[in-house]
């Protein structure tokens, strides 16, 4: 393919492809959400679960300093996944103009797990190009943690949502919940926002130490996985407002703030670790961009 047609397929600017350099790294990520997919099957809304997985892959790649490559803006399942990954190597080589120069450790990469016998997909797969020369910085005591707000659950804690909203409150997945102004199942598996452009802008414009998509275990454990332990961070949940679905959970199940920040995303889609000195300029810039963001915590050791 020509660079122009390739860039159109990827949804990226042509100059980004022209900037590929020797030493750029490929990133492969997989985002699984088995419970969400089961719920999607019951709702006949596979598109919601699929999109959630795609966007998780996009955000993970962007947070690693990479450009998302969208051959994988589809969900790939079963044996076909390895073939798609192998194909990607050749597309990337054509884009770089060096057909011999793109190396992948294996031509056959097992990237998905099929969880349904009827062929319904199990994982979102993303391949990206890591920007040459980008390096994250180690968080240090006193650094600030900025949170970007979201109304999406990101699929975190979905079993707890199911227990409270479906079982305890006796709702079906397709039932309308007045407090949420939404269908129960849709509220639980709403896809997270695509943060790729915002992440790139933050990396390019500010001295950001790390950016963490809150999309795996919960707000505190996802940040702790990067900082080296929960004892190294202090999150202040009173500093921002939870989305409607978490407020409903808190009311119905009498959940504490400490439980919420450990088992859900708590309404935070991205956590940004920065030096305390640049916290205010970043918050002001985000506010000007129309992005709801708050100082949510500190690195304490």
What is the predicted role of each segment?
Residues 1-301:
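Helix-biased detector of long, well-ordered alpha-helical tracts
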